[in-house]
Amino acid sequence: MGDTVSPNKNLSPVVREVDPARLDPDREFAPLLDIIEQARSRAFRAVNRELVGMYWDVGAYISAKVKAERWGRGVVTEFSHWVTSRLPDLGGFSPQNVWRMRQFYETYQGSEKLSPLVREVGWSSNLLIMGRLKSDEAKEFYLRLAALAVEGDAADGD
């Protein structure tokens, strides 16, 4: 039959190799570093969108329960303890933060302009904007500015 190569051997093609000592790593490997950093940045933004989306959904659920079933401080505190006992590595579910999730949802849920923007901005930035600004115009301006900063960080590879 012919010579066969084990799948675990000779994974790289047989070529005349460049002496690694003669390489300029900064020049040769920089494109690979760019690929890695861009992927990391995209992953971070995707995780952030999902996290903010989760906070939105939790806020919507809590808001509905407060209105329909008169959930109050005690029930929200019980939920906070319950979820942290089941997911001990998950942060961000203190009673105070759960109320912020409700406020976050109620602040933006009626706005077609603002609700898509909040997912492009980190949770801390959303809380600052929501807590310090009254008008929708000001919120929109700073949400857009914060979203551009996130994109700029991504372009820089940070």
PLM features per residue range, with description:
Residues M1-D158:
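Basic, low-complexity intrinsically disordered segments
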